[in-house]
Amino acid sequence: SDFSDALAEYGIPLLVYTTALAPGFDFDALRNLKSVPPWNCNANCGNYQEIKRFAGTDPRLREFQTLWNAIHSEWMRRWGTKVRGWWVDGAYFADRMYAFPDEPNGRSFAQALRTGNPDAILAMNPGMVYPPRAVDPNQDYLAGEVNDPEYGLLHGPMIDGMQYHVLSYVGQNWGRGPA
C-alpha cells in the first residue's frame, strides 16, 4: 500500500510480478502448494531433477492452481485498485495448465488476479518466444521477454491486436555483468 501510494505521487501505476508456479527453490512452498508437476518443468524451475521428488500425479496441477488462485485473490482483496496490473513469469506451460474449459484454468487465474480490481491488466510470460505471442486469451498485453530488445520492436506496438511490451536485461546478460 505504501509503495503504491509513493508511486501514485508521480503518476506511476503499480504492476506486480508473480509466477505461474510456486518459487522453485522454496521446497516447503513447492511441497505444501503441490506445485511440482509430473512432467519436466526444468524450463520454468531450472532444478527439476532436485524437486521432482515432490511431484504430484495431476498433469494439470489442479490442486496447486486452486491454492495459487486463492492466494492471489486474497492479495487482491487487500490491495484492490492499488495494483493496476500483473506480469506473470514462467507461463511456459500454459497449454498444460490453462488451456482448458473447466476450472482451474487461465480464466480462473486471471479472475483471481483481478479480484479487487477488475481493470487490472495482465501479461503472461511464455519465455523468450519469437515472434512474441499471447499464451492465454485472458491477458491484456504481451510479456515481451527478449534477449535482443530491438528484435521485438520490428513488429511495432501491437502484435495480434495486443499491446507489445519489452522486458530485457541491462548489462551483459540476465543478472550478470556490469550495467
Describe the residue ranges of each PLM region:
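Mature catalytic domains of secreted/periplasmic carbohydrate-active enzymes
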Residues: 1-179
